[in-house]
Amino acid sequence: MKLGYNTNGLPHHRLRDAIDLLAEEGYRSVALTLDAGALDPYDDDPAHLAAQVRAVRDRLDRHGLGRVVETGARYLLNPRQKHDPTLMDPDPARRAIRQEFLQKAIDLARDLDAEAVSLWSGAATAGTGEAEGLERLASALGPVLAHAERRGIPLAFEPEPGFFIDTFARFAGLDERIRHPLFDLTVDIGHVHCIETGAIADHVRTWGPRIRNVHIEDMRVGVHDHLMFGEGTIDFPPVLAALAEVGYRGGLHVELSRHGHAAVEAVRRSRAFLAPLLGMG
């Protein structure tokens, strides 16, 4: 496993400074959240974006850092409503906005030599039935997966509390409809603790071969709030042992997007907590 950090937790840093900081603090992977001012795929100047992508890729390479592309920016597609629109939108034209964004993310992932693109479903509108929602989502993912296949970029789908696909069981229902070799999982350890029943480690063992990306933070049962390590109720050693047991070698990305006001402290505290559990110096 490669200890990593999500750039959504460094919103007040220039991306180049965030990458340098993470490398200096001993991180080995970066989850790059595409956002305003950070590899914005809607940059008005395509040449500027291309130059930024090359510079970021070269900087990551120079530091020997792994990387995934994250698509969870809050207001990138709609400055007035968070995480809108989504693949669950009943309006095909609005779904197409999210599809286009994900296709742009796939293109950037290819140019960055990223290991995967992480994504989620979004929330369903009131009254959406289970079968209807699964069919809508699977259909919306079709063009995205086709683009991922053309570019050779795996997708890592994240179950998210409050969204239509919130549990492993619902992911399994979607996966049955998708059945694509580039369609795998982002597992957020806090989300599993928040919403699933049973030990986190058991879920990791069940889904081990499908885990392409991991988010990690502390959390409490039933409360979707990303907490600093030690402030929640997760027992981390069995979880990390299970990830090692299933042979997971990707990024273990700390996700503390609401800690940006104290980002440097959060970066250091997170590593101080996790490094001994991972056998890092």
Where are these regions (language model features)?
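Catalytic domains of carbohydrate-active enzymes, especially glycoside hydrolases
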Residues: 18-36, 113
